């Protein structure tokens, strides 16, 4: 068994090392007593590979490795560098060749790390002081046409985090996320999080979540919440806005939610005693300036 295992391991390494696009390969097999052997394969492509080279390795090489090992499944990671962007593709995944091809098309210089995984494609951007224009991926992007994988974007803007979670068929580009970030008062930006979700897990609504930190509940005021809410009043895409306030010593944040329809807030918020003053402040002419 050990000799046969070593022979298969050597064949896999020889095959991968012989591919033109491959810079290096590492193959490991972990014997299991009562389960099939576990195979892990790390493949590093040559820098700046073409889309065709990436697709060939992700699709054809994985199938060949399965055949050579005789295993039902192999955990394989294909990595490469495009410009200054590091890309990691974790196999197996559904429609791996399509996911890899679409990801290569979506790469841009501002991206630092990209991961293609079983359920999602995540784009992590380099820290900057201002959110780039046209940051939100448009529906025309190839990765958003896949449908089988979630697509997420994340970036650190100064001291605030911004996350975008997409869904097939949902266009988020009209949501003024950049303006919302810029309206957060400077004393509330440290650790603040602004998340835009095309579909939340429960109600499948387009939702904006703003989370800020305060030292004590006594420091809570409506200014930051009202500023963020004001930027999205009138937006036709958002169906809900949630404003969260956390105190470092407390586990559960306080949440004020607003349902929206056709750009207008429905009711006074939930709970209304917290939502009403925020909404009133957000509706002032200079609320988002």
PLM region spans:
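Extracytoplasmic low-complexity, Pro/Thr/Ser/Ala/Gly-rich segments
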Residues: 1-53, 96-106, 176-188, 279-289
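Hydrophilic extracytoplasmic domains
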Residues: 237-289
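Short amphipathic alpha-helices in soluble, non-transmembrane regions
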Residues: 15, 54-65, 103-105, 134-146, ...
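Surface-exposed beta-loop interaction hotspot
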Residues: 79-196
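Short edge beta-strands and adjacent turn/loop segments
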Residues: 19-43, 111-122, 187-211
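Intrinsically disordered, low-complexity segments enriched in Gly and acidic/Ser/Thr residues
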Residues: 170-255
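Acidic helix-start/capping segments at beta-turn-to-alpha-helix junctions
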Residues: 30-38, 73-88, 159, 245-252
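A short interface-forming secondary-structure element
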Residues: 41-54, 127-131, 206-221
């Amino acid at each position: 068994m050990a000799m046969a295992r070593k022979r298969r391991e050597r064949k896999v390494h020889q095959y991968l090392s012989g591919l033109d696009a491959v810079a290096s390969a590492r193959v490991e097999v972990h014997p299991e007593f009562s389960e099939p052997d576990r195979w892990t394969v790390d493949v590093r492509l040559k820098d700046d590979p073409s889309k065709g080279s990436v697709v060939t390795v992700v699709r054809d090489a994985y199938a060949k490795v399965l055949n050579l090992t005789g295993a039902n499944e192999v955990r394989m990671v294909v990595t490469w560098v495009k410009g200054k962007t590091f890309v990691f593709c974790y196999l197996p995944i559904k429609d791996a060749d399509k996911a890899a091809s679409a990801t290569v098309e979506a790469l841009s210089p501002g991206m630092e790390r990209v991961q293609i995984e079983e359920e999602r494609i995540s784009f992590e951007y380099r820290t900057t002081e201002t959110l780039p224009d046209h940051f939100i991926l448009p529906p025309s992007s190839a990765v958003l046409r896949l449908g089988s994988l979630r697509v997420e974007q994340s970036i650190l803007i100064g001291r605030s985090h911004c996350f975008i979670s997409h869904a097939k068929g949902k266009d988020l580009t009209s949501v003024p996320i950049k303006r919302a970030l810029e309206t957060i008062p400077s004393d509330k930006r440290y650790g603040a999080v602004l998340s835009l979700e095309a579909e939340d897990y429960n109600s499948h609504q387009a939702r904006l979540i703003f989370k800020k930190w305060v030292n004590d509940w006594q420091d809570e005021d409506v200014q930051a919440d009202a500023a963020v809410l004001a930027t999205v009043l009138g937006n036709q895409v958002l169906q809900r806005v949630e404003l969260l306030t956390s105190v470092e010593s407390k586990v559960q944040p306080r949440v004020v939610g607003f349902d929206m329809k056709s750009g207008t807030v429905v009711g006074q918020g939930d709970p209304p005693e917290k939502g009403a003053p925020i909404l009133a402040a957000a509706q002032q002419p200079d609320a988002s300036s």
